[in-house]
């Protein structure tokens, strides 16, 4: 998934793996649940050495807006070399995935900066800076948006995403390069909120807009800054 030789950083590896699994299971007449598809795709990616959270894989496998809490990836990766596939897939991985029916109406956007994400070395540097305080605060901010979506609390949703964005800035300046800062600033003065997505340092950012008029302004600002709109989806009460 690329344009002019530049790869889109929006979970394309996970997309390819999930779609390949679905194609094979369809060919052989097998019916896999969303959970089974997720676990099989995560298994494949872990075996390849992928170090991601697998959150993108969960979204793709469930084809829905979800709350996601990752499993112990290190433990499962170690078992891949020790146990058969059937045994690993049959285990309770400890993953938490819940479908969300939002009580808010909003546009969800993905903007592409056309710049590569930070390198694996920089990712490792960022990981080394992660503290217990950072983990505690981010966990709180993962729970708040779920509650806000279910309760229709727009301002709490916006505040929480802003807090996560601030935590990432404090964690490492490498996460928000200039293009991602522009992507985020484009939401200022609008009924919108934007932040980086994925590893950071480039690739993609996301935005939520709670006003159709502001959605148009946001996209125009992105376009003027050379940021491509890769994806748009409307969620909520009037979808």
Each predicted region: which residue ranges?
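DPxDG-like acidic metal-binding loop motif
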Residues: 9-31
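A sequence/structural signal of beta-propeller blade repeats
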Residues: 34-35
